[in-house]
C-alpha cells in the first residue's frame, strides 16, 4: 500500500453535527529523544513506560459551517487554551489530504488529564493520540 490508498476520492455521506470522545494513556520517558528532523521524526530513539492510570480524555464536538479554512478552538479543563492551537493547526494541515472534510466543520476540542498538566508526564502525546 502507498499513501495514495488512503486519499478518499469523495464522500457520499455527511453529518450536520456530532460529538466523539476518546481516552488515551500517557507515558513517561526514561530515555528521552533530543530534537527532531524532517516531518517531526525524532533524532534518536527513546524509551518510555505507558502509565495505565494517567490518561487524557478528549471530546471533539463538530458542526457544519459555510466558511473556508480550518475552524477550531481548544479547551483544557474547561478553559480556552489558544496556545495549543498551532499544534492542532499543523496536525490538521498534515492530515487534510486524507481527511478533506476537516474544512467543512467547526470543531470544539475539549481535553482533560487525570494528572497535573506540565508535570513531566507526556500530556501532549496522549492528547494528540486521543484526538487522532
For every predicted segment, state its role.
Residues 121-132:
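DPxDG-like acidic metal-binding loop motif
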Residues 1-119:
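ATP-binding N-lobe of GHMP and related small-molecule kinases
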Amino acid at each position: 500500500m502507498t499513501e495514495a490508498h488512503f486519499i478518499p476520492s469523495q464522500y457520499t455521506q455527511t453529518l450536520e453535527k456530532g460529538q466523539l470522545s476518546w481516552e488515551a494513556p500517557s507515558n513517561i520517558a526514561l530515555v528521552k529523544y533530543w530534537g527532531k528532523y524532517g516531518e517531526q521524526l525524532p533524532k534518536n530513539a527513546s524509551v518510555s513506560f505507558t502509565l495505565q492510570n494517567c490518561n487524557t480524555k478528549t471530546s471533539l464536538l463538530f458542526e457544519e459551517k459555510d466558511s473556508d479554512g480550518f475552524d477550531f478552538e481548544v479547551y483544557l479543563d474547561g478553559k480556552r487554551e489558544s496556545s495549543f492551537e498551532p499544534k492542532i493547526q499543523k496536525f490538521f494541515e498534515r492530515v487534510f489530504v486524507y481527511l478533506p472534510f476537516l474544512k467543512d466543520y467547526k470543531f470544539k476540542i475539549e481535553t482533560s488529564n487525570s494528572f497535573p498538566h506540565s508535570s513531566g508526564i507526556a500530556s501532549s502525546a496522549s492528547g494528540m493520540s486521543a484526538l487522532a
